[in-house]
């Protein structure tokens, strides 16, 4: 029994990789239950399965309904906001709203929504700006917190957030890789900051991590993406290794697929960089997440 308890605030459990499917081809057997088992063993108590568009949000909810530890989000990722305009925008928003409103208890956040100016090839800036702001209607009506995404778009993100902050009960900016100043501005809006492997790549990232009060931090894996690579500045602080194979084998992690069990490695980096006791920090991160996303517990 692990002495730690975690809530993975961002996990893409609907990704076909956890079913053994890569680029549409079945490469190995479905091992989702093994993946969950490894995570539970190291102390993951709740999994927040992210919704990236309407269909993905439906799939995330459907999966969340199969396990008492699973919860989900409902929203549209900035790179997929073009879907609003491919359909009837008001109807698309209404369907997202109905999905969240009718499944409270399993749906714990609105998102993933925000801005991503690193990947404008998937969705132009104006479309992202318009439909990020539009999704505050979901948060306002459901009274659910937001699961937020901000990539290379801090000024515009902050502008929209300030204008609409009173329309949402709170939220977390996940997979944070911004500056100390950006983090401080988000904390001034009483938002939380989520860290995963993508947040721990450089020494500058680690300095940002040190600057954030522990009562404003959350932890995530964003698996199967955002694993900690050996080239990442944070990797030197990892103490826990998992049996890993380059080619899939039952009972082992797979080399290039991040898993929720790796959340222990994120904690090890965070606690070492911040010079904090790992157990104390884990408890703080857990309590922060309960406060925002599971207030009824």
Curated annotation (Swiss-Prot):
Its EC number is 3.1.21.-. It is an enzyme of class 3 (hydrolase). Gene3D superfamilies: Metal-dependent hydrolases. InterPro entries: DNase_TatD-rel_CS (IPR018228), Metal_Hydrolase (IPR032466), TatD-like (IPR001130), TatD-type_Hydrolase (IPR050891). Keywords: Hydrolase, Metal-binding, Nuclease, Nucleus. One of its GO terms (cellular component) is nucleoplasm. Pfam families: TatD_DNase (PF01026). One of its GO terms (molecular function) is metal ion binding. The keyword Nucleus applies. The modification N6-succinyllysine is found at residues 27, 46. It is found in: Nucleus. A divalent metal cation 2 binds at residues 112, 149, 174. A divalent metal cation 1 binds at residues 112, 222. It comes from the Eukaryota. Its cofactor is a divalent metal cation. Binds 2 divalent metal cations per subunit. PROSITE patterns: TATD_3 (PS01091). Transmembrane segments: none annotated. Belongs to the metallo-dependent hydrolases superfamily. TatD-type hydrolase family. Deoxyribonuclease which catalyzes (in vitro) the decatenation of kinetoplast DNA, which are circular DNA catenated to each other, producing linear DNA molecules. Plays an important role in chromosomal segregation and cell cycle progression during eye development probably via its DNA decatenation activity. This is Deoxyribonuclease TATDN1. The gene is TATDN1.
